[in-house]
C-alpha cells in the first residue's frame, strides 16, 4: 500500500487551483467537476460536495495539519507571495529554527496551513 494523494477542501476550486499554480507551479491533471487532481499528489475538493459526503461542518484554520514545501531561494518565494497575494494571512513570517532551517507559514485562501522551508 502507498499514500496516493492529499486532499484539501476549498470554497472556490478554480481560485485555489490558480493559487497553487501561481505559488508552487502545481498543474491540473484531471478535473472531475468539483474535484481537481493536481500534480504532486494534491487534490482540491469543493467544500459543498465534501460537506455533503461527510455530513459534517468544515473547520477552517484547524491547524491540525499542514502542506509542507521546500524552496531553495525562500527570499524570492516570499517576494512572489507578497506580490501575488498581498493579503495572505501569516501564521509566522520568515523565521530561522535552531537547526538553521528558514521557514514561513501561512494559510491558503481557505485556511489550509502551508509551510515553506529551505531544504534540510
Region locations from a protein language model:
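Short loop segments at secondary-structure junctions
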Residues: 11-13, 41-42, 47-48, 71-74, ...
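Vicinal oxygen chelate
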Residues: 3-11, 36, 56-120
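Short secondary-structure junctions
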Residues: 25-30, 87-91
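Conserved short beta-strand elements that form part of the metal-binding/catalytic scaffold
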Residues: 27-61, 113-118
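Amphipathic alpha-helical segments
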Residues: 14-26
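Short beta-strand-to-loop elements that line the ligand-binding cleft
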Residues: 8, 29, 93-96
Amino acid at each position: 500500500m502507498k499514500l496516493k494523494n492529499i486532499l484539501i477542501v476549498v470554497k472556490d476550486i478554480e481560485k485555489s487551483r490558480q493559487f497553487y499554480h501561481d505559488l508552487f507551479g502545481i498543474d491540473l491533471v484531471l478535473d472531475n467537476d468539483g474535484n481537481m487532481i493536481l500534480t504532486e499528489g494534491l487534490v482540491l475538493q469543493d467544500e459543498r460536495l465534501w460537506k455533503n459526503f461527510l455530513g459534517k461542518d468544515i473547520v477552517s484554520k484547524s491547524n491540525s495539519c499542514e502542506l509542507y514545501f521546500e524552496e531553495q531561494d525562500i527570499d524570492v518565494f516570499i517576494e512572489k507571495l507578497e506580490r501575488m497575494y498581498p493579503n495572505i494571512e501569516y501564521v509566522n513570517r520568515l523565521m530561522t529554527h535552531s537547526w538553521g532551517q528558514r521557514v514561513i507559514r501561512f494559510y491558503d485562501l481557505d485556511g489550509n496551513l502551508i509551510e515553506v522551508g529551505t531544504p534540510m
